[in-house]
Amino acid sequence: MKQSKVFIPTRRDVPAEAEALSHQLLLKAGLIKQSTSGIYSYLPLASRVLNNISKIIREEMESIDAVEILMPALQQAELWEESGRWGAYGPELMRLKDRNGREFALGPTHEEVVTSIVRDELKSYKQLPLTLFQIQSKFRDEKRPRFGLLRGREFIMKDAYSFHADEASLDETYQDMYNAYDRIFKRVGINARPVVADSGAIGGNHTHEFMALSEIGEDTIVYSEHSDYAANIEKAEVVYHPNEKHTEVAELEKVETPNVKTAQELADFLNRPVDEIVKSMIFKIDGEFIMFLIRGHHELNDVKVKAFFETDNVEMATQEEIVNLLGANPGSLGPVHDKDIRIFADNYVRDLNNLVVGANEDGSHYINANLDRDFKVDEFGDFRFILEGETLSDGSGEAKFAEGIEVGQVFKLGTKYSEAMNATFLDNQGKAKPLIMGCYGIGVSRTLSAIVEQNNDENGIIWPKSVTPFDLHLITINPKKDEQLELGDQLYKELQQQYDVLYDDRKDRAGVKFNDADLIGLPIRIVVGKNASEGIVEVKVRQTGESEEVHINDLNTHIATLYSNL
């Protein structure tokens, strides 16, 4: 394709709001154009890359007998009400009404729709298992869209859904999909690591995320340098190692702590280590107010709280609710009180004598508060985030942290949706049973961004050959010179027989062409310049920067060798 005929609006400036490197490069290289916050148009180069990513996904889905369909983006509210997610999903669900007042959602996911399709058609265990997938746009009303394609309000996803008669069948498909995802990310050129994860709003009891390692990643991965252990920090278990209490129990004493709001401020004010401070927090869980205690240098993990109580109905109590309950504001709360509130504490609170806790009076704290003497804990558990350097649950050593971009996730849904929506089949005994489900997603547009995030240098993008918008970038330095134009046209005609070629026939300066070529980042560049009359061109590999002068008689062989080694 001739570059003079392709819409590639490259730019030299970077918008101030473009924080992520991938966002900057996709804008500068002319791949995307922002319509409004979190919404982008995919320009010709991006469209070609997305097609290549989708082609790889389709090949891998077909290899495990997944069948492609296309479902509506516009979903009626009644389906979401059946599953219980219409009220539970939250403000991220984009809702609208038609002219008759009927409510709809722009789908962020398609569990309800696909379940409604199969419940009318799958009647017997003989029709199972079945896996359906689609590639289409999704919608999510993000509070703060950021990082370009990494967190947008409209995005492209591949989502798949599997239906089974038993858990063994689900396990098999789950593993097939897990392996297919691993192959997909390797093929598109992403260093992605599968990690144990939380299922979030989709639900289910078993899930893995595929995380593309990146400094800009919004998720923290906990991993081992000595084993295959990897987990999202929300799911990483904290191993409890009891420590003996060596200090003598002292008398409970109330002290004034004016204008102290945080655990660190309190530690500084009292000249105590922050890990001897105990933070008290009030949550509302299924309508019940519950106090949680954790040490001052730890952070409460609400995902673990939800898992412990087996409910998603978990929220922080409001300031008004806390004041009505305990008579003090957050920052002055503590377990020493006579209120009928259950108290749960992180395991590592057990190790402390003479705790510093809030006195349930603004500007006051207790020192030397002790478990059992001054307050009771209903139950201990793992309620916090792991710290880097702590022992991993698989015994392989210390926890290491890395940042990652979630590019895919696989879920075992079980019967959550089939039971709610009455999707049943007849087993081999003629008994009606709910379909057992799995769901599996890949962020296609997010994968595009993650590829750029991991494959670049100071000059621009470096496309992996599997997804590159074009294989070769053919450039004539000065098309006004007949020998260059003629050789360029000749090579363009010949190379198109084997490769996708972007032919820069523009009448711009050589520097502009070279800068654009580096920015766009096609794997191999062929430059027709001053030696055109001798049949010699320069061939440059974008990834390594290595270049070599090659006679056109040897060009096909040379390019084939280079391409096979990319």
Swiss-Prot record:
InterPro entries: aa-tRNA-synt_IIb, aa-tRNA-synth_II, aa-tRNA-synth_II/BPL/LPL, Anticodon-bd, Anticodon-bd_dom_sf, Pro-tRNA-ligase_IIa, Pro-tRNA-synth_IIa_bac-type, Pro-tRNA-Synthase_IIa_type1. It catalyses: tRNA(Pro) + L-proline + ATP = L-prolyl-tRNA(Pro) + AMP + diphosphate. CDD domains: ProRS-INS (cd04334), ProRS_anticodon_short (cd00861), ProRS_core_prok (cd00779). PROSITE patterns: AA_TRNA_LIGASE_II. GO terms for biological process: prolyl-tRNA aminoacylation. Its EC number is 6.1.1.15. SUPFAM superfamilies: Class II aaRS ABD-related (SSF52954), Class II aaRS and biotin synthetases (SSF55681), YbaK/ProRS associated domain (SSF55826). It is an enzyme of class 6 (ligase). Pfam families: HGTP_anticodon (PF03129), tRNA-synt_2b (PF00587), tRNA_edit (PF04073). It comes from the Bacteria. Its main location: cytoplasm. Keywords: Aminoacyl-tRNA synthetase, ATP-binding, Cytoplasm, Ligase, Nucleotide-binding, Protein biosynthesis. It is found in: Cytoplasm. One of its GO terms (molecular function) is catalytic activity, acting on a protein. GO terms for cellular component: cytosol. Disulfide bonds: none annotated. Homodimer. Belongs to the class-II aminoacyl-tRNA synthetase family. ProS type 1 subfamily. Catalyzes the attachment of proline to tRNA(Pro) in a two-step reaction: proline is first activated by ATP to form Pro-AMP and then transferred to the acceptor end of tRNA(Pro). As ProRS can inadvertently accommodate and process non-cognate amino acids such as alanine and cysteine, to avoid such errors it has two additional distinct editing activities against alanine. One activity is designated as 'pretransfer' editing and involves the tRNA(Pro)-independent hydrolysis of activated Ala-AMP. HAMAP family: Pro_tRNA_synth_type1 (MF_01569). Consists of three domains: the N-terminal catalytic domain, the editing domain and the C-terminal anticodon-binding domain. NCBIfam families: PRK09194.1, proS_fam_II. This is Proline--tRNA ligase.
